[in-house]
Amino acid sequence: MRRAGYECEYLEAPHLLPLTSEVDIDGEVVQITNGKRENARAWFLYSNIDNADASMALKETPMEYIGLEASISRLKTYLEQNSDGFYAVLGFSQGATFGHILSQLVCAEKRVLGANTFCKIKCAVLLSGFPSMHNILLPDRATSGSVATNDSCSDMNDKLDLRSLHIYGDKDTSVPKSFAEKLSNLFVNPETYDHGKSHMIPHNKALIERVVTFLDSCYSLE
């Protein structure tokens, strides 16, 4: 990306995931391993009991994303502390879902006179994502990140008028292609790219060129 002239900033998600969890199996508490990756982090959590429990991630029912406000605050602070310019958000898996939430905030902020923080984001590249099931209050109604009722967020059902590129693989079993397609359908004129692989970001020339072409087209409109 840097060779194409784009500077990448890797922001760290605020929630540290535990390496082990305790679960109840037939009345007996058993310790399980959540993987070997140390410093694994999340933009939000699904359970107050077990921070590593992601069993609700693909449930297509409204829910509260625990700790989301901390992530929104982190992005807001970053944007406020940096100069105006061309910003794009890129996220993978849960990061792509967080990108969906940020896209909602971008479009909501456009309707608020004088609001110009999230509006710095001009486009989104969302890889292997799924639609957010967390309802947020619009900036002109309350602090972003607060939980709201469906009635107060009715206009959030409108398609998001933000340039977007949705990347996924038809062999993905962690976040099936259908979820990424549902996410893309929440945007106006989404662009899509199927890399044909599983739940991963392929490091190949074709994918990089597709992303750079998309970013170049968005930048040319500024």
Segment roles from a protein language model:
Residues 111-131:
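A conserved short beta-strand
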Residues 1-88:
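Serine-hydrolase catalytic machinery in alpha/beta-hydrolase-like enzymes
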Residues 96-112, 124:
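Short glycine-enriched nucleophile-adjacent loop
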